[in-house]
Amino acid sequence: MSSTQFDGDIDSFVSYLKSNRGLSANTLKAYRADLTACLHLFELRGVTDLNEITLDDLRSWMAVESRDHARSSMARKTVAVRGFFAWAYEHGLTTTDPAATLMTPSIPSTLPAVLTESQAEQLLDVAEHAVATNQYKDDGGAAAAPGSGKAAGKTADKSADTVNRSEAPARADKRDNARVTAESQRNAAILELLYATGIRVAELVSMDIADIDFSNRTIKVTGKGNKQRVVPFGLPAQRALETWLEQGRPVLARTATDAVKSRAANALFLGARGGRIDQRIARDIVHRAAREAGVPDISPHALRHSAATHMLDGGADLREVQEMLGHSSLKTTQRYTHVSIEQLKNRYGQAFPRA
């Protein structure tokens, strides 16, 4: 990320948001990147003072940025810039607020892509099958006792040499097999939990083990703006989580260095090196699972859409789904009723004789 002479002002603004708005770390990171890129562009144009930036300058910046970014991204960038200049004006850094009338680009209301219920079931079945076919009983990497079989009658040196050369690859194979099994168990648990709860991928990767309440079959989720909610999950997700925590997680945890292990000690899901899993890996797990299951390619967010739509199809109340998804506005949740209507039209056309 390019640095600018305005980095100090950006830092102060982000600190203000963190203290007063309760925005998530991901949102703050995105705002910081948006502001740095915007002000770096003005710096390249010779701007040395925030007071030199006008509304026309900001509109010109938006025109440049909109060539390479979707409207949803531009909407976020505009909110960040408008918020920054409002803060700068309130704190006496500028004599005017040039962004006060800067318009946020309208975002077209598109129907989210979703899997059918049978496709979702197929996705989860394939993940469960992968656990079964990759099943490997991990023994913690213990080696067989030396000095047995043909090596017993030879000298200690020869015996040790034989064991070292023959058993080292075997131990490596055991570790590799155990890791593959552990990752399959983790992937199945991730897919089950995403679909069962409709949580966001950012919420998933930030979860700790303590956030799961198996007795009530619920999870505590920290969403946007650090707002917390409690979401229920079903028996298939419980089984997948228990298998991962009891069998798979200890295997991946052993691969971590002491420093990584300390940072990820409470993390629910781990990566291949034993650290807390990141969003990129979680997204890749979902995309890869969709390919292997032969269903339409989806993202974790599309799996969230699918969960919401299937709940509404099953008779759930709209406000219940709103609470589950952590939407601040009911209008956001209402998008999923449109999807259900489209599915109803398709079913009607296929099943009704006078369609």
Swiss-Prot record:
Q: In which organism is this protein found?
A: Bifidobacterium longum (strain DJO10A)
Report one GO cellular component: cytoplasm
**What is the name of the protein in this document?**
Tyrosine recombinase XerC
Relate the protein's function as given in its record: Site-specific tyrosine recombinase, which acts by catalyzing the cutting and rejoining of the recombining DNA molecules. The XerC-XerD complex is essential to convert dimers of the bacterial chromosome into monomers to permit their segregation at cell division. It also contributes to the segregational stability of plasmids.
Active site annotation, chain numbering: 200, 224, 301, 304, 327, 336 (o-(3'-phospho-dna)-tyrosine intermediate)
The UniProt entry lists the main location of this chain as: cytoplasm
| Core-binding (CB) domain boundaries | 4-89
Matching entries from Pfam families are given as: Phage_int_SAM_1, Phage_integrase
